Amino acid sequence: MDLEKFFDTVCQSKLIEVLSRTIKDGRVISLIHKYLNAGVVANGKFERTEIEMPQGGSLSPLLSNIMLNELNKELKRRGHRFVCYADDCMIFCKSRKGAERTLKNIIPFIEGKLFLKVNRKKTEVAHISKVVNAQKRVP
């Protein structure tokens, strides 16, 4: 599963809400909010960042992991096995039908609760019927 233009679509208010659950010092939240709204210089031009998260910023990888941890917690709560790297995620299911159902059920959480967009062109259900132990093949 791929999240479409992740850094460009992170909802700042949702991120601040998630951070506020853990960070009780309003001054820290205020500093992070100012960081998110400070803007970026891209191709020699200043661009405002009023909605999204600045890509390439020093805090952005940490903040993106905090935001995506909400997805991880939800997948774990639902009992799924998964691997995520940045804005890409693989969810492992026992059957194709189960995988299709899982995808159908997790998209509303991602888009409705986290306000992120699933890239349906890059997201697919794949079925792996047999896994070969690579160590057994080594002579």
Predicted regions located by residue number:
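Conserved polymerase palm-domain catalytic core
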Residues: 1-131
